């Protein structure tokens, strides 16, 4: 049986000191009843420094909250390659957003909990990062300057410069931020 250690929100093999070749980054929104959420994702190859695929899952495309959440888990199953770590945006209730969450059923933290449990049950390494950790550091102009994304129209919409892009949303762009941040600062 493998020994695992959970350090805060980081679940990896205790003896793991290798770099991951692939990063499957997720920007989940569990909101099914509260605004129809969108989960953005990307699969990044750290050796080639390129995206393999990215996209979005839309809650409105599913009949129930649980079916949507299962689709996110299925996405992990379909895109998890050998030597992959899952990097997921964590949910943190910021003081300036507190009033907006009154009477919320907190669907996004529930989805994130499902994803963490799935990773734990199947011994998939994962790491949680907050939005504030990556949004300022990886603003669009920085990602564009580094060649990860390109501006595609005058409305300020961006797309990755490599890989397939099945469906795309600003949540996909946030997943890109999480992948790049982990690849550069934490993948060691």
Model-inferred region functions:
Residues 2-188:
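Phosphate- and other anionic-substrate recognition elements at nucleic-acid/protein interfaces
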């Amino acid at each position: 049986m493998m020994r695992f250690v959970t350090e805060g929100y980081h679940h990896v093999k205790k003896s793991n000191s290798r770099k991951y070749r692939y990063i499957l980054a997720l920007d989940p929104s569990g909101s099914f009843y509260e605004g129809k959420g969108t989960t953005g994702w990307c699969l990044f190859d750290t050796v080639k420094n390129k995206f393999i695929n990215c996209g979005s899952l839309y809650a409105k495309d599913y009949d129930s909250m649980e079916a949507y959440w299962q689709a996110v888990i299925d996405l992990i199953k379909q895109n998890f390659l050998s030597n992959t770590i899952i990097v997921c945006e964590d949910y943190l209730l910021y003081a300036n957003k507190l009033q907006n969450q009154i009477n919320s059923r907190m669907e996004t933290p529930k989805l994130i909990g499902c994803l963490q449990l799935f990773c734990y049950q199947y011994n998939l390494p994962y790491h949680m990062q907050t939005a504030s950790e990556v949004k300022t550091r990886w603003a669009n102009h920085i990602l564009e300057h580094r060649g990860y994304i390109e501006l595609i129209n005058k409305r300020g919409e961006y797309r990755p410069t490599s890989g397939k892009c099945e469906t795309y949303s600003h949540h996909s762009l946030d997943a890109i931020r999480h992948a790049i941040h982990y690849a550069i600062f934490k993948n060691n």
